[in-house]
Regions:
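Acidic, glycine-rich catalytic/binding loops that coordinate metals and/or anionic ligands
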Residues: 159-193, 200-201, 291-300, 319-349
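Cationic-aromatic interfacial patches
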Residues: 24-159
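Short, well-structured beta-strand-loop connectors
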Residues: 248-258, 289-305
Length: 349
């Protein structure tokens, strides 16, 4: 028997009005026209490396890296400056046996976050002649008053010896007095003992030539045999690379050219400033290709190697000075010269 007509009419009106099918009832949350309900997600943990960490707690105001330096190696001194006005003119000194000062340098500001600890740094070099044993680093104010001290031990180190015969021309370069040599020496010395505030690089440095052949090493104890049979001694201040004339010589790090000119003893010479009191030197060049005052990027060509000045053959003499003191170039290629994070870790131990 067919359903009554009034029932069918009512059923049609129900579907036209959007009513649910009598055969299937879709859950309300599954309706296409109903937006899904989004439950609030649990707060996710931010990766530790992305969180803003608080500044480290300073437990000791003075830190020195490395802890057991060898003769010829640089020392980076970090000092947490007290919140006082008496923090200008600070200097760091390396004191050896019998209280003898081995080297000294001025502090400079290390750039950092505005809310972080205020750290100053000074870079020293352990002289190649320093005796092994107990030593200390002392922080002094402008009046010479000691503000902080830290003990350390200078490690032992052996240096090679070499004998170099000189012809008459090179003998004269070393032994005959010349006011021009004196003036050139005084001019360069004034530059190398100057400590400014410019930080051009943090290091590490890179060698200035693509050659592994070395003819002399840092700290070599030299004996010069002069043409008349007499002799003289010196300590080699850098590294000599046995490269042919015309080899490209490049900057070991970013820096500013503070000297680019011929000199009597060292021939065509270039000097770069990299950090306050830290300089690299390039001697005996055949050509100079930079000008004084220019800013140079690491790897830029400074000139070409040669044999100008007091040289027994073509080579490049590469030297590093720290507050006027000779320093081993290899130490500067091994690690950064200025590492604020390492200093802060040391201060927080």
């Amino acid at each position: 028997m067919s359903p009554p007509k009034p029932f069918l009419a009512a059923l049609a009106l129900f579907f036209l009005a959007g009513g649910a099918s009598p055969l299937y009832s879709r859950p309300a949350g599954d309706r296409p026209d109903t937006p899904p309900t989004v439950q609030p997600a649990a707060e996710s943990a931010e990766p530790a490396e992305l969180r803003e960490l608080p500044p480290p707690e300073i437990r000791t105001p003075l830190a020195v890296l490395p802890e057991g330096p060898r003769p010829g190696e640089p020392l980076t001194v970090g000092y947490h400056v007290p919140d006082t006005a008496a923090n200008t003119g600070l200097r760091a000194s390396l004191i050896g046996a019998q209280g003898r000062r081995l080297s000294r340098s001025s502090f400079f500001d290390i750039p950092g976050d505005a809310g972080g600890p205020k750290i100053k740094a000074a870079i020293l070099a352990v002289p190649s002649t320093a005796a092994p044993g107990a030593a200390l680093v002392r922080v002094e104010n402008a009046s010479g008053q000691a503000l902080a001290e830290l003990s350390l031990v200078i490690a032992d180190r052996n240096f090679a010896a070499e004998e170099i015969p000189l012809n008459q021309a090179n003998t004269n370069l070393r032994t005959v007095p010349d006011p021009r040599k004196t003036a050139e020496s005084e001019y360069l010395t004034a530059i190398l003992y100057r400590t400014g505030n410019d930080i051009h690089t943090l290091g590490p440095f890179v060698p200035p030539v693509m050659s592994a052949r070395r003819t002399s090493f840092f700290g070599d104890r030299r004996v010069y045999r002069y043409a008349d049979g007499s002799s003289g001694t010196s300590i080699h201040a850098g590294v000599d690379y046995g490269v042919p004339t015309g080899t490209a010589v490049t900057a070991c790090a970013d820096g500013r050219v503070v000297l680019a000119r011929p000199r009597i003893v060292t021939g065509n010479s270039v000097v770069l400033e990299h950090l306050p009191g830290v300089y690299s030197i390039y001697y005996h060049l055949d050509k100079i290709l930079v000008e004084e005052g220019a800013f140079i990027n690491a790897g830029a060509v400074l000139g070409e190697s040669g044999s100008t000045g007091l040289a027994t053959g073509p080579h490049l003499h590469w030297e590093i000075r720290v507050a006027g003191e000779n320093a081993d170039p290899d130490a500067f290629t091994a690690r950064p010269v200025l590492d604020k994070e390492a200093l802060l870790r040391k201060m927080s131990e």
